Amino acid sequence: MINRVTSPNRKNRFKAIIIGGTGATGKQLLNQLLNNHNCKLVTSIGRRPVFDGKKNDKLMDIVIESLFKLSSTEEYWKNNDVFFNCIGTTRNRAGGAREFINIELGISNEAAKMAANANIPHASLISAKGANHKLWAKDWIHPLLYIKTIGQKEQTIISNFSFNRVSIFKPGMLIRLQGEQTWLEQLSESKGFGLRVDTLASAMIRDAERVKFDPAQESPQFYIGNECIKSSLKL
């Protein structure tokens, strides 16, 4: 049985650290964490300021030249309860297959290492439905490369690090909010398909609250598919 967290409790309040806080889901996650009474402090590490540099008493916004230099941020990882990985890119945005792998897998692994070394008990990761680290893939076949690389990202955080709890969210198509949507996202949302990024963010926070309330829950915990993620908000 999973316990519902209904109101703020000093014992169950948590501190969070996030990478990918300027992305579609990461922005929503940050905003909701800052407005969540169970979260007492959020640290964001990225290449750009979040919220255009606007200040918030609950936000520690750490801007670095490159996420490949996460080792320079060691002090900020300490004394957190949950690490959120919202890193997400594509081959085109990254500049090529190797660059895509270096970002999705390389940065994710380095961040997981920083979190594990800081003894953060809970890691929460955005993956993708269908991700499979065992899949055959060539660099020039991006759909297969994407599925394999994302699968490797989730597999390494499970196998290579000693978190007390790992939560992996595997959504299908994601729908960004108005003003950021592609025509396909607009069409999908109008037909009732896809998962809004703010809903995914809410599910990740609800999961973090449950883990803080009951650390002995099963690990790793997979949330596979949009309907499963939506249903987790009702638990």
Predicted regions and their residues:
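C-terminal helical subdomain
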Residues: E189-P220
